[in-house]
Amino acid sequence: PCHNPTGYSMSMEEWQEIVAFLNECGKEVPVVLLNDIAYIDFSYDLEHCRNYIKTFNDFSENVMAVIAFSCSKALTSYGLRCGAAILLAQTKEAVRDVEIVFEKAARATWSNVPNAAMENFTYVTTTNYDAYMKEKAMYVELLKKRSDIFTEEADACGLDYYPYKEGFFVTVRIEDNALRDVFHESLMKQHIYTVKVNKGIRVAVCSLSSEKCRGLAKRMKEILDTCK
């Protein structure tokens, strides 16, 4: 959900297709699905955005899901690195086997996560939960307003972008990476700062004011046209 860099979120039907496909693969080899939910707490439909996880109940015994959760993203505390790997499988034995490996690998690689990050997450999910959810709802609405401005204006001026549903980022579609590089340089010369991704330019609407979102798509389209 809220995919980085496109802002795409898959439907329940798409997840069901993936589960069926992975079960077929599981007939030949063990399969592990890594589901990155770093930005899920900024979904525009927070009440239902986790419903798709129920489809994981249909995984065969040869398929496991690892859900990667980021406290750093959920709490917008990027400097306090903290997260979790949630293991889901049909047998307790399979979960425990992977849990042991994760425990040893994580401990050997990073030791413990910062105490401040753990303390902050505990505080926000208990004592300060209601205040956190209220504040976050305000930011989700602000994010939706910004993304609506950019995508609606992109549609109006013909600036192509990858399918977007929700989240921090919108990615402009540039199939030719050589053109993308020229476009990226031209944007910077006009003080428009984006991130290059494969066959695209990522726009972080999360870091732009609504005012700066207005007219941005049109400016980018005009600059792109001069690069062709």
Give the predicted meaning of each segment.
Residues I86, T171-R173, A204-C206:
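Short hydrophobic/aromatic beta-strand micro-patches
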Residues N57-V140:
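Conserved core segment of the aminotransferase class I/II
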Residues T122, E135-D155, D160-R173, K196-K199:
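Conserved glycine-rich beta-strand-loop-beta hairpin in the small C-terminal domain of fold type I
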Residues V19, N177-K228:
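PLP-dependent enzyme catalytic core of the Aspartate aminotransferase-like
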Residues P30-V32, V66, F169, G200-R202:
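Structural preference for beta-strand elements that scaffold enzyme active sites
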Residues M12-F21, E47-F56, K144-D148, A217-K218:
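Well-ordered, non-membrane alpha-helical segments in soluble/globular domains
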Residues P1-H48:
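Active-site phosphate-binding strand-loop segment of PLP-dependent enzymes
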Residues C25-E28, D58-E61, C157:
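Short helix-capping segments at alpha-helix termini
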